[in-house]
Amino acid sequence: MTIMRKSHPLMKIVNHAFVDLPTPPNISGWWNFGSLLGLCLILQILTGLFLAMHYTSDTLTAFASVTHICREVNYGWLIRYMHANGASLFFICLYIHIGRGIYYGSYLYKETWNIGILLLFMTMATAFVGYVLPWGQMSFWGATVITNLLSAIPYIGQDLVEWIWGGFSVDKATLTRFFAFHFILPFIITALVLVHLLFLHETGSNNPLGIPSDCGKVPFHPYYTTKDFLGVILLIMLFMTLVLFFPDKLGDPDNYTPANPLNTPPHIKPEWYFLFAYAILRSIPNKLGGVIALVSSIMVLALLPYLHTSKQRSLSFRPLSQTLFWMLISDLIILTWIGGQPVESPYIIIGQVASILYFSIILIFMPIAGLVENKMLKW
């Protein structure tokens, strides 16, 4: 008699995805972040569900309801801080996952990569609308500034902004619909994750060498379930250290002040994981130009499969491209720092140079480096 996991229609799907999945024998710890992202998503949905039971999406009571959760709900403070810091953890894993994809040439699986970019956009949208919900100063002004960017779209811009607001300013209607979006988007993300995995399992995983490994593949369980479990333990340790010892380290103190449309904070800025894109947006002294640059900073990832000029897939044996990759990472760290600084000299010029460098490395230098390396290897 065949084993149930191999014969039952539902269990067969799970079996092919997590148990008998043929996996390259040499994938490193950088491949752990896919499963860690799955864990983060489950964590966010569960903590978010419990928060939604006590939260009220009304401008008069939203801030008070968050205070109520922290003070009067059993372990409400823990659920709230797990959810808030869980978002930061989600983006840390997400950026490492994308970085690994760039380094090892995983973007050549075009369908998987494009679904991944769509997932990044959806996650950013979810995090943005979620940041508005506590209805603190930075929530209100962040929502006002970022949604206002849509008014730069020619002809329909202003109508679009007022349609999203549900009025002539960010108010009760905006908060209510943002709560609805924040509740539904994670489930859409979950569906997209399944599509992401579906496309990935069509081709099989890439590996650090960037060469086919069909002849030496091993089953996912027990080898990689064990390996992923180590990553899970380390992640939970890091996460709980952050939540229990430094719960407000990554937040903004301004968000502990209730939203006031008559009082603008001195520095309006998004959460740390959006600062690199915010710096690129601010580096162009034109509203429409800034919005185009902001969208392009993510959409440029979709061009990577078409800009791949090297005969090798991975950067493992390409020192020139490796140098450019780490320059790109350093540049993103500089952009993140600049995004949190006021708009004044010397930050303006540093931000502009870093923004130009970001696009130049991806669009110009990396494809050229690939061609040079081919030439050096006489390929």
Curated annotation (Swiss-Prot):
GO molecular function: metal ion binding; ubiquinol-cytochrome-c reductase activity
Superkingdom of the source species: Eukaryota
CDD domains per UniProt: cytochrome_b_C, Cytochrome_b_N
Subunit note: The cytochrome bc1 complex contains 11 subunits: 3 respiratory subunits (MT-CYB, CYC1 and UQCRFS1), 2 core proteins (UQCRC1 and UQCRC2) and 6 low-molecular weight proteins (UQCRH/QCR6, UQCRB/QCR7, UQCRQ/QCR8, UQCR10/QCR9, UQCR11/QCR10 and a cleavage product of UQCRFS1). This cytochrome bc1 complex then forms a dimer.
Organism in which the protein naturally occurs: Cratogeomys merriami
Keywords carried by this UniProt record: Electron transport, Heme, Iron, Membrane, Metal-binding, Mitochondrion, Mitochondrion inner membrane, Respiratory chain, Transmembrane, Transmembrane helix, Transport, Ubiquinone
Role, per record: Component of the ubiquinol-cytochrome c reductase complex (complex III or cytochrome b-c1 complex) that is part of the mitochondrial respiratory chain. The b-c1 complex mediates electron transfer from ubiquinol to cytochrome c. Contributes to the generation of a proton gradient across the mitochondrial membrane that is then used for ATP synthesis.
Name of the coding gene: MT-CYB
An annotated GO BP: mitochondrial electron transport, ubiquinol to cytochrome c
GO cellular component: mitochondrial inner membrane; respiratory chain complex III
Binding site for heme b b566: H97, H196
Compartments, as annotated in UniProt: Mitochondrion inner membrane
Family annotation (SUPFAM superfamilies): a domain/subunit of cytochrome bc1 complex (Ubiquinol-cytochrome c reductase), Transmembrane di-heme cytochromes
Positions bound to heme b b562: H83, H182
InterPro entries: Cyt_b/b6_C, Cyt_b/b6_C_sf, Cyt_b/b6_N, Cytb/b6-like_sf, Cytochrome_b, Cytochrome_b_C_euk/bac, Cytochrome_b_N_euk/bac, Di-haem_cyt_TM
PANTHER family: CYTOCHROME B
Miscellaneous note of the record: Heme 1 (or BL or b562) is low-potential and absorbs at about 562 nm, and heme 2 (or BH or b566) is high-potential and absorbs at about 566 nm.
CC cofactor: heme b
Cofactor binding remark: Binds 2 heme b groups non-covalently.
Protein name: Cytochrome b
Transmembrane segments: 33-53, 77-98, 113-133, 178-198, 226-246, 288-308, 320-340, 347-367
Family: Belongs to the cytochrome b family.
